[in-house]
Amino acid sequence: MDSVSFFNPYLEANRLKKKSRSSYIRILPRGIMHDGAAGLIKDVCDSEPRMFYRDRQYLLSKEMTWPSLDIARSKDYDHMRMKFHIYDAVETLMFTDSIENLPFQYRHFVIPSGTVIRMFGRTEDGEKICVNVFGQEQYFYCECVDGRSLKATINNLMLTGEVKMSCSFVIEPADKLSLYGYNANTVVNLFKVSFGNFYVSQRIGKILQNEGFVVYEIDVDVLTRFFVDNGFLSFGWYNVKKYIPQDMGKGSNLEVEINCHVSDLVSLEDVNWPLYGCWSFDIECLGQNGNFPDAENLGDIVIQISVISFDTEGDRDERHLFTLGTCEKIDGVHIYEFASEFELLLGFFIFLRIESPEFITGYNINNFDLKYLCIRMDKIYHYDIGCFSKLKNGKIGISVPHEQYRKGFLQAQTKVFTSGVLYLDMYPVYSSKITAQNYKLDTIAKICLQQEKEQLSYKEIPKKFISGPSGRAVVGKYCLQDSVLVVRLFKQINYHFEVAEVARLAHVTARCVVFEGQQKKIFPCILTEAKRRNMILPSMVSSHNRQGIGYKGATVLEPKTGYYAVPTVVFDFQSLYPSIMMAHNLCYSTLVLDERQIAGLSESDILTVKLGDETHRFVKPCIRESVLGSLLKDWLAKRREVKAEMQNCSDPMMKLLLDKKQLALKTTCNSVYGVTGAAHGLLPCVAIAASVTCLGREMLCSTVDYVNSKMQSEQFFCEEFGLTSSDFTGDLEVEVIYGDTDSIFMSVRNMVNQSLRRIAPMIAKHITDRLFKSPIKLEFEKILCPLILICKKRYIGRQDDSLLIFKGVDLVRKTSCDFVKGVVKDIVDLLFFDEEVQTAAVEFSHMTQTQLREQGVPVGIHKILRRLCEAREELFQNRADVRHLMLSSVLSKEMAAYKQPNLAHLSVIRRLAQRKEEIPNVGDRIMYVLIAPSIGNKQTHNYELAEDPNYVIEHKIPIHAEKYFDQIIKAVTNAISPIFPKTDIKKEKLLLYLLPMKVYLDETFSAIAEVM
């Protein structure tokens, strides 16, 4: 008889007779009742949800006291002043029917409805606080001949129910300039329309725009207004001069909640942080049918959740495990036991409300863990979990923007939202910041932490879990280790500091930094500078700026491909596009849209940029200084100040904060150009984007012309850079061999290397002074010798005698297998570090087809051929390590979304599913090996040969040696193609022709031979 290993009060109905007010679906593995039993128990239960902790039973409720936590009561504060730090803010609405407990001073702001900004943070004493801010108006601007008719139109929109909400609003004349297009005069017939309710403002603004009104700034949200209009920080310290505590009828779940008017707040510049609480969590699921769990399937339940509670600084490390069924003790871990999945999830969310962390991290939690929990509570249990956020009527949810569904995983991401909580998923963070063959947690931990996960296979988890308390402890440890690793990754990369600095700089919330694109971060900055100049931003509708003329992108000069055994100097333009925009005053505010506006100006006051049949004109700084240019200058100046401050900073934490700040400034500067070129953005302007790239092309071409015409004699270098005849080893040859967007490659023959290295920065300064306007600056970056220039965007060069620089070659592509990379690297190393091979390569590249036939290849080339023969032997004799033969592709979307199903990585996933093995997630890099085809099937496609590497190793399946060797030949040819002589023979065929012939017999032939 099976032993009962878990007391379930619902199956022992007579033991507990108290009923809850509502019933719920109860789902639990049969194995937690009877060790080893398969399947699930599903029924409806009307008993109160509960949990067990250290052999004691606790009823689950929102207001319960959590047994393992010691929650201190808040202290009394001086009502006249308080200092606090905020990390998040949300906009909310309040209505007349909810003002019973609201102090009288603030009621008129929300009658009949109104905006309340809720700011979340910590007091200077470290207590969690919610600050309710009243009096922030939301507004837009509208052109209308008569203000009274505009008021009547808005009243009508409210009364007819199109807006479905009413609030107070005010219309007043406004005297503003438009940011878009140079205009010395203010906008005529302009009115500012202000609302007490941000939602109503946005809806009416959109309706007016659709009805043909010219409107401005309807896309500016109320939080941006709050930060920009008041000069407030979105992440930082505040003083509140006076406030009233919200003691009764709180809107938040925090101990300290206060009300104040927007004018009572004072933003402070202190960059230090208080101590914020963080969670790292991970979930384990049980797929009912052995497949990868789907949150919407009733039987695919969550069986465990691990939580590591820690702080942004310090060593606090508190470990919690939520589990179905009883579980053996795990040292240092608080274990909470539950009888059903609903109770486990409810307990987790109650714990979230009570401990109330400010930051939550994990690995792929946005796309899986949190999403899974939200879907289970919503779709399966129909339970609103918003009350477990920082607000009692808050929100916990996920969304994938509709327009992003088709983009694939790497471009789109699930947006997660919890009122007062910031999610910092380490999966997208590390995916964007490091290069790895795949981005599984185990791989990233090995690379970044030099740690490996203790493995528990996908198939073992269900067996262990239902085996008994000890098995559940094994699964629990496995679940906990993921959370522990993420904490270490979180503290290593310090992404939260970077997010905070971008938020402060861009006047946006930290949540916006994490989940929105660069446009949403640049837009408030432009709004801020425009406001300073009494300018307003037009709200764009579909127009010529959105449809746009096509404009030519960045220039890449046709490379003079070849193997260069002489030094090649590489120059870079510093911050090219921002520099062009500053140097030439390119901006919305300087763009000439109406020639009548410049009738009184001379041509010397105007920059004209010609692009084929199109011409764009901009006024120069003497007429109006560019808004974008001012922003860029300020940011770059701040970055220089921050970097200088870093040099003198001895405090490690302060130095880290300063580094994140300078990085935020750099990223923001580089994003401005992209905002103007985004066709469907908030402020698109093809004229600016096209002019920037056009001027960039002109700069590149003028540099090439100057070098190839002026810098060709020894006399020039002696006069300009102080060289003497001893600095030259023969007739000087200087030539630009390649130009790529913001880089220039200049080959220099017959100059002493040390002399060239000494004057290279001087050459960059000389060209800058002769050709460009400030702040455009050409800088010396490096010298490459030798250099293999393969084609556009692809080259290999040696820097500083030992460092190899690769760009665009198979050696660094994620899709190439390690074996191919290893062979290519060995051959490249021969070309760059073996003088005999270098000499032979130069000779080989100049040989004719006749010379090849008569003389054969130079001796040094035989070293390359020998390495290829060794690789061929390893492959055809099955001596190559399968782990080094793994190819990979990213599962960028759900399998059903692929139009082409016959892809190698999809074939592997289907094989895994057939064998009921663990299925990868969207976004994972799928590893596979090409196996040998059946006899006679030489033309088999890759998708038919692709197999999971572990399966190949386990079953000792032979690999497809011919395909792998073919990959090697192609990769080597691509990497070293410039050393091949110019013949009629294709380079791949020539390389194969140079290799000695050898026949390899397969196992079938060998067996026949043995019999005979």
Swiss-Prot record:
Listed GO MF terms: DNA binding; DNA-directed DNA polymerase activity; nucleotide binding
Signal peptide (from-to): none
One GO term (biological process): viral DNA genome replication
Compartment(s) of residence: Host nucleus
InterPro entries: DNA-dir_DNA_pol_B, DNA-dir_DNA_pol_B_CS, DNA-dir_DNA_pol_B_exonuc, DNA-dir_DNA_pol_B_multi_dom, DNA/RNA_pol_sf, DNA_pol_B_thumb, DNA_pol_palm_dom_sf, DNA_pol_type-B
UniProt keyword list: DNA replication, DNA-binding, DNA-directed DNA polymerase, Host nucleus, Nucleotidyltransferase, Transferase, Viral DNA replication
PROSITE patterns attached to this UniProt entry: DNA_POLYMERASE_B (PS00116)
Predominant cellular place of this UniProt entry's protein: host cell
A Pfam short name: DNA_pol_B_exo1
Family statement drawn from the similarity comment of this UniProt entry: Belongs to the DNA polymerase type-B family.
Designated name of the protein: DNA polymerase catalytic subunit
Gene source species: Human herpesvirus 6A (strain Uganda-1102) (HHV-6 variant A)
